[in-house]
Swiss-Prot record:
Name this polypeptide is given: Quinolinate synthase
Key words, A-Z: 4Fe-4S, Cytoplasm, Iron, Iron-sulfur, Metal-binding, Pyridine nucleotide biosynthesis, Transferase
GO biological process: 'de novo' NAD biosynthetic process from L-aspartate
Membrane-crossing residue ranges in chain numbering: none
Catalytic activity: iminosuccinate + dihydroxyacetone phosphate = quinolinate + phosphate + 2 H2O + H(+)
Source taxonomy: Bacteria, Pseudomonadati, Pseudomonadota, Gammaproteobacteria, Alteromonadales
Family matches, as NCBIfam families: nadA, PRK09375.1-1, PRK09375.1-2
GO cellular component, one term: cytosol
Pathway field: Cofactor biosynthesis; NAD(+) biosynthesis; quinolinate from iminoaspartate: step 1/1
Cofactor binding description: Binds 1 [4Fe-4S] cluster per subunit.
Residues that hold iminosuccinate according to the record: 50, 71, 142-144, 159, 229-231, 246
EC numbers on record: 2.5.1.72
């Protein structure tokens, strides 16, 4: 499908990458882990971590009775868990989603500075104006968005259910505004044939995967299956043996007969993917072409901010304003409507909704 003449133009944004956490010694790591475990008990808190956080953070979440998953499942786990406080190791929109589903709970994050290029690239004022210019369109937004953008939408979707929802809306003759990920939107439009106006955002990690370099790597490992997240460019998706959400890619590595996999998504997923597929070889898909020109290099710089020191600080700091997530109640109620609409639709399909990045 050719780009709509009414779609916003693609702007090159120089995102302000955060500094990487200072490496800790083994002794410091052990001390922080012990302190965090004690504080979780004292504060009646549970730690949930996204697939893209560093392996030691995912392991700590599992060791302490928390969970490792995609952002929506993290929020649902926190909602259903008896703990009064939820520590969200991820990026800011994930904390907001948790607060939308659990307004009565305290939602803390290791740092409120951990954001997302999809969130930054879809400011509510510009996106709302875009929607207002096309009032006859149904607004569908990816879960990787702010609470304000969700509140402006008719539907919120994850990558695991986006195809089904767009097919449903298209069957009803609905014209669709899609935001913010242009690659995922283009993939869905191609699969469904739906008429969609695209917001022109992208994930800095997935946007860097390169088809030519991937083709070269495939020549080195001809027996490897290529697993691709649909936030990747169309030329990369076209080379995939399996395309899917985070949880769907983990399942593919577990169930496919191949012994090797080239994986085009954030390398943080390797922790859970290796658990699900022990003995199989996982290979990073190339970013930035054949030269050392990548910026994210297959790992989200904001996810990397969720270090042990920051998690300990979120539990021990007396000043919670640097860690606590707040969502205006009117905004929360509005954002809950399209989220609930998705969850109710999933029930009609008898499927568990997972898979936003």
């Amino acid at each position: 499908m050719s780009p709509s003449p009414f779609a916003p133009t693609i702007e090159t944004i120089d995102y302000p990458f955060p500094p990487k956490p200072i490496p800790l010694s083994d002794a410091e790591k052990a001390d922080y882990k012990a302190r965090i475990k004690q504080l979780l008990i004292e504060k009646d808190a549970v730690l949930v971590a996204h697939y893209y956080t560093d392996p030691e953070i995912q392991a700590l979440a599992e060791e302490t009775g928390g969970c490792v998953s995609d952002s929506l499942e993290m929020a649902r786990f926190g909602r259903d868990h008896p703990a009064k406080t939820l520590i969200v190791a991820g990026v800011k929109f994930m904390g907001e989603t948790a607060k939308i589903l659990s307004p009565e709970k305290t939602i803390l994050m290791p740092t409120l500075e951990a954001t997302c290029s999809l969130d930054l690239g879809c400011p509510i004022d510009k996106f709302s104006a875009f929607c207002d210019a096309h009032p006859d369109h149904t607004v569908v937004v990816y879960a990787n968005t702010s609470a304000a953008v969700k509140a402006r939408a008719d539907w919120v979707v994850t990558s695991s259910i986006a195809l089904e929802i767009v097919e449903h809306l298209d069957s009803e003759g609905k014209k669709i505004i899609w935001g913010p990920d242009r690659h995922l939107g283009s993939y869905i439009a191609k699969q469904t044939g739906a008429e969609m106006l695209m917001w022109q955002g992208d994930c800095i990690v997935h946007d860097e995967f390169k088809a030519n370099a991937l083709r070269d790597l495939k020549r080195v490992y001809p027996d490897a299956a290529i697993l691709v997240h649909p936030e990747s460019p169309a030329s990369v998706v076209a080379m995939a043996d399996a395309v899917g959400s985070t949880s769907q890619l983990i399942k593919a590595a577990q169930t496919m007969a191949n012994e090797r996999f080239i994986v085009a998504t954030d390398r943080g997923i390797f922790y859970k993917m290796q658990q699900a597929a022990p003995g199989k070889t996982l290979i990073e898909a190339p970013t930035g072409g054949n030269g050392a020109t990548c910026k994210s290099c297959a790992h989200c710089p904001w996810m990397a901010m969720n270090g042990l020191k920051a998690i300990e600080a979120s539990l021990s700091d007396s000043d919670k304003t640097t860690h606590e997530i707040f969502v205006d109640e009117d905004l929360r109620v509005k954002a809950l409507i399209p989220l609930t609409r998705m969850l109710d639709f999933a029930k009609t399909l008898n499927m568990k909704v997972k898979g936003n990045a």
